[in-house]
């Protein structure tokens, strides 16, 4: 990925360190909004119709939509993805992790607008008579686009990088990342098959960053020597866990797409 190396040299200094912390912080704020005043969340969704009518903050605020309604599950999810995200950032470097996460977000936004455009074109005659239908279609689309699959892309990327890393499922059952990733992939494929086109586009576009990552890293010769060193160094550190610092001590209690 020579283009990425060149891009990093040019704008790498603008990368956001500890991006996963900011992402988890956004989820937390969204959870607070949803708890205190649920109506606020309707103004945060990724609704193309409302964005095109001036509510441009939705291009960013959809990231605040809570991925969990249960506080306990939210805390577990936050701990799990914090450790995975920080591990990927240490392995890839801050810039590349930024590209991966922001790339997933950009693809998600593009997917929402593409789907809205298709639906609008298919229902143009009806919308001309019932303008409110455009907003309803947009809200329907927005419900399928969230950070759930962005989170999954983090999990899948980590599983590809460290397939033999072990986690404790339900804090009891030891299981390797590759087996959990297979379960995630099967569940996602099933969801893709049974969903309508809105769901399919949402899943595909949200995971497009992972698809690109997977096909561009299957051959590790594509890694630069510096990247290989970072990866090997992190693996070495993970083999020597310190109290409270190892991913091997983390479990995720409910196995579904987040």
Language model features by range: what are they?
Residues 156-157, 207-217:
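Alpha-helical transmembrane segments and their membrane-interface exit regions
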């Amino acid at each position: 990925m020579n283009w990425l190396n060149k891009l990093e040299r040019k704008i790498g200094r603008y990368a956001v360190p500890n991006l996963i912390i900011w992402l988890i912080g956004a989820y937390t704020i969204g959870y607070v909004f949803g708890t205190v005043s649920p109506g606020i969340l309707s103004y945060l969704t990724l609704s193309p119709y409302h964005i095109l009518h001036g509510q441009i903050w939705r291009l960013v605020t959809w990231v605040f939509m809570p991925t969990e309604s249960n506080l306990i599950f939210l805390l577990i999810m936050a701990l799990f993805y914090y450790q995975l995200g920080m591990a990927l950032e240490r392995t890839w470097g801050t810039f590349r992790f930024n590209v991966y996460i922001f790339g997933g977000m950009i693809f998600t936004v593009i997917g929402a607008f593409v789907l809205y455009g298709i639906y609008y074109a298919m229902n143009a005659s009806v919308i001309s008579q019932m303008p409110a239908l455009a907003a309803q279609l947009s809200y329907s689309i927005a419900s399928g686009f969230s950070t759930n699959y962005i989170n999954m892309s983090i999990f899948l990327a980590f599983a590809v990088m460290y397939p033999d890393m072990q986690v404790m499922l339900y804090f009891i059952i030891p299981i390797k990342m590759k087996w959990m990733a297979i379960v995630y992939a099967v569940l996602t494929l099933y969801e893709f098959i049974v969903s309508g086109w809105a769901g399919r586009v949402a899943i595909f576009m949200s995971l497009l960053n992972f698809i690109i990552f997977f096909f561009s890293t299957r051959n590790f010769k594509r890694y630069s020597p510096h990247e290989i060193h970072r990866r090997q160094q992190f693996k070495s550190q993970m083999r020597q866990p310190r109290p409270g610092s190892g991913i091997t001590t983390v479990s995720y209690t409910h196995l579904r797409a987040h």
